[in-house]
């Protein structure tokens, strides 16, 4: 029996392009593997310069940003992405090892939609992906 295209699950209908920015390669790769297990395409970069170059190649649907990185914070990268017309609509998701309210407040003030604490649970990632898909 042939399967019709509209019989596919809703999540398979749209494959998201997701950018992961984390200075820790293992953490970034792990996050990307989980996002890909959810059926989406994830690209990992290790610093803000690489993030800027990557968004020139392909504008992501969402950006998972480590909050504490050498040289520039994920909050500042998020602020810059918000002011760039090409990435102004990308969903920003903060990823950090800190659950202090000040980090969350700073992220939300810049326009981050979600705030995840490491280690990130698959269920929490799935929630962020569903939020991006819902618009």
Give the predicted meaning of each segment.
Residues 1-19, 123-135:
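Non-catalytic signal-transmission and effector/linker regions of two-component phosphorelay proteins
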Residues 113:
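Short, glycine/charged-rich "phosphate-handling" switch motifs in NTP-dependent
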Residues 70, 100:
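The feature encodes the CheY-like receiver
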Residues 39-46, 54, 116:
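Short hydrophobic/Thr-rich beta-strand motif most characteristic of the beta2 strand and flanking loop
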Residues 25-43:
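Two-component/phosphorelay signaling modules centered on CheY-like receiver
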Residues 58-64:
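Active-site beta3 strand of CheY-like receiver
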Residues 66, 96:
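Active-site residues of response regulator receiver
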